[in-house]
Structure formats: C-alpha cells, structure tokens
C-alpha cells in the first residue's frame, strides 16, 4: 500500500500535523497584536497591513532584522520559552526607533529540530507580548522543521520589523554639540548580547546546573532567571519623548556595548563623556566581571552594563525629557553624561 504524503514526510522527520497544531495554539496570542490596519488573518502567503499615512508628509519605511543569539541556550536549559520572543521583538524594534520610526509590523522565523506545538506556541506567546509592548502587529511568521540539521530539542529564532517615519523627522545628529546631555534608559539585565561570553564566564555548557544556583548578589533570583530577563522594549516612552523634545541621537546598546554603539549616533567631532561612577551598574554585571576576571574595558566593550538605550538631547530640554520618560514607563531613566569635543566614548 502506498504511503500518504504526510506519512512519508513524517518518516523523513517532518510532522505536518504538529505544524497545524502549533498554528492553532498560537492564534490566541497573535490575535492580541492585531489592529484595524491588519487585513486578513494567519494562513495567507503574506501579511497584509494597511498603511495609514495620515499625519505624514513624506512617509519613509524602515526595516530591521535580528535574532536572540545564544541566549536561546539558556532558555533551552531552563526549559523556559515564553519570554525569549520578547527579546526577539526588542532587538528589532529598538533598532528602528533609533531613526525616530514607529514600528508597524513584525514577523518571526523559528527553525527547530522537531516541531513540538506547545513549545512553539510558548515562543510565539513571547513574540506576541513583545509586539504588544511595541504597539506593532504580528502579521506573519514561519516555523521550519529541520530534521537531520538540528537536534530535536533545539531551535533558533529571528525576527523582522517594518516601521515608518516622516522623512523630515528622521533623526540626524547635525545639530549635536558640546554640552548636550546623554540620558540613560536602564536595561533589565544582559538583554540579548554577549551570551557566548556569559556562558564561558559561568561554564554553563559544562555545568548547566549553575543556572539553578542563587548567588547572593542576585537577591534571591536564580542565575538562570536573571540571565533570561527579557530585553526591555523602549518604543512607547521614546516615541513620547520624540513628540516634545529635540532628540539629536539615539543608540541601542547591544553587542559592542558602550564603545561600539554610542558612537553610532554621534556627530563627527563629538564624543560622549561619561563618568564611570555615574553609570548605574546592576549587581549581575559585577558578578560576571568578578567570576570571569573580565577587565573593565572588556565589560563596557561587550555588555550594556545596565544601560539599554541612550538619548542625546539639548541641555535645556534634558529635565523635560526625563519627566516624559518617568511618566511613560521609564521611572529610572537618568542623566548619564554629556557631549564634548572629540571622538567616540570617553569613560572617565
């Protein structure tokens, strides 16, 4: 008797039924992200979104893509998959707001060794939560089963976003000058960069049980929970600031830390002057530095050190910007440093 297509595919390692099941399970989460601009639902060949250009003179679309990196290994060891999707969204939308843009839509891509519907749904639950936090719609995605290429219990996660900004309001640093103030928006922890070094510092690959320990520095949290704290999404508070303040530059502090990311928003001839004692460094980073015997320079050149995003604003508007941030979900935002003549980052 000839086997059916699904039976043959299943024998090859791809479970079509599991794929259908995962879609059904994730629908409730995706629905949370939909708004009046979304056309159709899941299942189409492309995600449709009606672009409302009201209020835009010259709308410009901006796109971004990123993944979560080896933070996924921590999620797999901890068997906790419902927040890693927030990280994926954050890595993309936090990038596009650096241009002053509002994220509109998001799509996710999951590659896995075996499609376990409940696990896939948990991942998408996090993606949907991230989209809600960023006020954008999850209009599509793909779950690809890769038998023979990936271990059955492993997966990778990436995302893609498209946003919009008025051409005249695209952020540029032309008016940046000495005396402008740099504001810090705190991170929740390591966020989604530097985890290859984190895994080495704590020898996680050889001793995964270390993730279940509760170092005194972490105030009762397990190391795994502290490392899995989802990346903060800064979209809503930053967009509020952009409405009322002349923001001259925004940097998302990701891989490369202060030294690589802050200069990306600086005008040529300007440097970011930051006093080390003014950086509010969470205990987790001190624990990492001490455990791994990492130099201070390497810490600031790899990790966000407690600062997930920086905004540069005129000195006369710094207090106003902080008031807006404090009233819109960033109560611990603070003045980090100033712009001075020079280049790059000056940690003094």
Descriptions of predicted regions:
Residues 2-12, 119-134, 150-157, 207-211, ...:
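Glycine-/charge-enriched secondary-structure boundary and capping motifs
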Residues 53-54, 67-68, 162-164, 188-190, ...:
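Short, glycine-/Ser/Thr-/acidic-enriched flexible segments
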Residues 22, 26, 48, 92-93, ...:
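Buried hydrophobic packing segments
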Residues 23, 121-124, 195:
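Hydrophobic face of alpha-helices
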Residues 28-188:
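Glycine-rich phosphate/pyrophosphate-binding loop regions near the starts of catalytic domains
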Residues 156, 169-220:
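Short, acidic (Asp/Glu-rich) active-site segment that either coordinates a divalent metal cofactor
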Residues 15, 66, 179, 252, ...:
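Residue-level signature of catalytic and energy-coupling elements of molecular machines
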Residues 2-37:
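N-terminal amphipathic/basic leader segments beginning at the initiator methionine
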């Amino acid at each position: 008797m000839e086997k059916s297509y699904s039976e043959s595919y299943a024998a090859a390692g791809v479970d079509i039924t599991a794929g259908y099941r995962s879609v059904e399970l994730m629908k409730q989460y995706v629905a949370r992200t939909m708004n009046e601009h979304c056309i159709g639902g899941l299942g189409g060949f492309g995600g449709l979104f009606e672009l409302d250009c009201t209020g835009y003179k010259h709308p410009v679309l901006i796109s971004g893509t990123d993944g979560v990196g080896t933070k996924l290994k921590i999620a797999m060891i901890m068997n906790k998959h419902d927040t890693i999707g927030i990280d994926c969204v954050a890595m993309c939308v936090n990038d596009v707001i650096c241009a002053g843009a509002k994220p509109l839509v998001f799509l996710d891509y999951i590659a896995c060794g075996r499609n376990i519907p409940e696990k896939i749904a948990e991942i998408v639950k996090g993606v949907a939560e991230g989209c809600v936090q960023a006020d954008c719609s999850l209009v599509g995605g793909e779950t690809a089963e890769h038998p023979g290429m990936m271990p059955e219990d492993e997966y990778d996660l990436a995302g893609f976003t498209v946003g919009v900004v008025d051409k005249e309001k695209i952020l540029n640093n032309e008016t940046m000058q000495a005396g402008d103030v740099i504001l810090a928006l705190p991170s929740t922890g390591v966020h989604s960069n530097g985890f290859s070094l984190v895994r080495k510092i704590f020898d996680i690959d050889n001793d995964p049980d270390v993730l279940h320990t509760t170092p005194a520095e972490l105030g009762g949290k397990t190391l795994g929970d502290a490392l899995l704290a989802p990346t903060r999404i800064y979209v809503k508070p930053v967009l509020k600031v952009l409405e009322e303040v002349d923001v001259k530059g925004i940097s998302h502090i990701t891989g490369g830390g202060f030294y690589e990311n802050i200069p990306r928003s600086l005008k040529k001839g300007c440097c970011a002057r930051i006093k080390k004692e003014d950086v509010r460094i969470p205990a987790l980073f001190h624990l990492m530095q001490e455990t791994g015997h990492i130099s201070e320079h390497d810490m600031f050149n790899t990790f966000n050190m407690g600062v997930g995003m920086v905004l540069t604003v005129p000195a006369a508007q710094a207090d106003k910007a902080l008031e807006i941030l404090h009233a819109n979900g960033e109560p611990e935002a603070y003045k980090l440093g100033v712009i001075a003549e020079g280049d790059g980052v000056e940690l003094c």
